Amino acid sequence: MNIFPIVKYSVAEDSYTTDSSHINWSHYSDGGFTLSLTSGLLQIRQHEELIQSINLLDLWHQLIPGTKEKCLTLLSRAPCMNIRAFTNNVMKRFQVKFPSDVHYMKAKVEFEKLGLVFKDAKSSSEKKQFNNSQSQSNNSQELSLMNNAYNKSSAQQPNLLLQPSYIPMTQTATTAVNNSTNYVNPAPLQHVMPNAEIFSNTPPLKRFRGDAGMTQMPLRSDTSIESITASQQPTWDENVVITSSPFNPNRNAYSYGANSQYPIIAATPLNSQTQASWVAQPENQAYANLIPSPPTTSQILPTELTEEEKQLRSKVLFYLKQDSFIQLCQSLERVWNKM
C-alpha cells in the first residue's frame, strides 16, 4: 500500500452529464487527508475516515454508454491531480493537491505503473485564455510588421514640400513679311506657385534635376489628338514647309524665351531663294560662332513630294498650331532654364 499526504481535497457535486461548466465544488484544507493506492483501488481518508473509494482499473477499461469516452479520466498538473469517474450512471469529480512536487511525482509514478495515463489538466477557461493570449500576441506581431512596413515605405518616400517660386517667362516672336523680320517683345509672363505641401500620395509628377536638387511638377493635361474632328483638318499651301526649329503657325518664327541660346528659324516656302533668317539676341552673341544654323527642310527634302509625304506634312503643320504644342514648348523652356 502506498500512502501520500494531501494538503487540499476538492469534490464536486455528482452530475449526470459530462459537462462540467455549471458544477459546484467544495474545498477542504483542514488537514489530515491521505491518498492510498493498492492494486488499482484508490481511497481517500480524513483522520482514518474513508470518504472516497474507486476502483481505477475497472473504470479504465470501460466506456461511457453511447460514447467513445472512457469511464475514467485522469488529469494532472503539478502538484494537483483531477479524477473524473463515471460509475452507476453518475459522474464523480474530485481533486487532490500534494504538499510538494516530489510527493506529486511519486504518486504519479504509482498511477503510471498500473497503465493509467494522465492528460493535461488545463481547464477550458485556461485554454480559452491561452488561445486569446496567443491570438493577441499574433495580432500584435502582425500590427508591428505592418507598422514597420509602413514606416519603411514612408522612409523611402519622404514628404515633399514645394515652396512658392517666381519664374519669369518671356516670349519673343518674329513675323516674316516680304523677306523682312519684325520683332515683337511682349511683357514677361509671371508664374507664381501657391503654398502647397505635396506628399507621396499625390498624383503623378514630372521630375527633373535642377540646381537645387530634384524638383517636381504636376503632369500637364495635353489635348488629345483623337479629339480633333475631321472638320478641323487644315488647308495649307502646298508650297510651304516648316523648318527644323520650333515653329508657331500664328507667328512665322517663335523663340523659347529671352534666355534661349538657340537661334530662331522662320518658315521657308518651297522653291524660294530666301534662306531662313537667324534672329540674334544679345544673350546669343557668345554662341554666334559656336552653334551653326540648322538646315531647312527645303535643303533636305526633294522639291517633289509624294502623296504620303504631303499628308504627313499637312498633319504636322496642323498639330503645330495647337495650344498643347505651344504649352509643351513653354514647359521645355522652363525645364531647360533650370538645368
From Swiss-Prot:
Keywords: Meiosis. One of its GO terms (biological process) is reciprocal meiotic recombination. GO terms for cellular component: linear element; nucleus. InterPro entries: Meiotic_Rec114. Pfam families: Meiotic_rec114. May be involved primarily in the early steps of meiotic recombination. This is Meiotic recombination protein rec7. The lineage of its organism: Eukaryota, Fungi, Dikarya, Ascomycota, Taphrinomycotina.
